[in-house]
UniProtKB/Swiss-Prot annotation:
Organism: Geobacter sulfurreducens (strain ATCC 51573 / DSM 12127 / PCA)
Stated name of the protein: Elongation factor P 2
UniProt GO molecular function: translation elongation factor activity
Keyword Cytoplasm annotated: yes
InterPro entries: Elong-fact-P_C (IPR015365), NA-bd_OB-fold (IPR012340), Rib_uL2_dom2 (IPR014722), Transl_elong_fac_P/YeiP (IPR020599), Transl_elong_KOW-like (IPR013185), Transl_elong_P/YeiP_cen (IPR001059), Transl_elong_P/YeiP_CS (IPR013852), Transl_elongation_fac_P (IPR011768)
Gene name of the encoded protein: efp2
Amino acid sequence: MYTVADLKKGLKLTLDGAPYLVIAFEFSKPGKGQALYRTKMRNMITGVILDRTYRSGETFEPARLEERRMQYLYKEDTHYTFMDNQTFEQVQMDEDAVGDAKNFLIDNLEVDILLFGEKAIGVTLPNFVNLRVVQTDPWVKGDTSGSDSKPATVETGYILRVPPFIEEGEMIVIDTRSGEYSTRVKG
């Protein structure tokens, strides 16, 4: 059990049966009366943000979250399917819960899935992924009038800016945290 004194940014707790992440916290002690704890929390399933004020002595349940290593299998309609490599158990996530991670998911990619009970509520990607460029404009040697980058589409449909020497069919390394080109795959 957490008390209001335990509240801080980044704390994960259960409120009304759903997991919440504290994203802002403020303590105030008026001249007379009890101390007040103002919080801003994000529902980890729906993304809804709550503003709540609590008084000293109130308690909260910690969020029972588990992170498991899983393998991305496939997408069907708006659902993404992942498999636990130890138990071979499969879980599905809605496109909204997957978020921007969908731009970097390729078959058999190992990811960490955040579970609340049996419900998958989040995906943590590796910091870098290798993806194949499927469409980009050709580079004209000696063309110095253009910029130092050009748009490219990778196999997942994600569009990013790459250096002009990158060609269709090449494998590139993308930083999943920023979504930017990192380097060309060697070999």
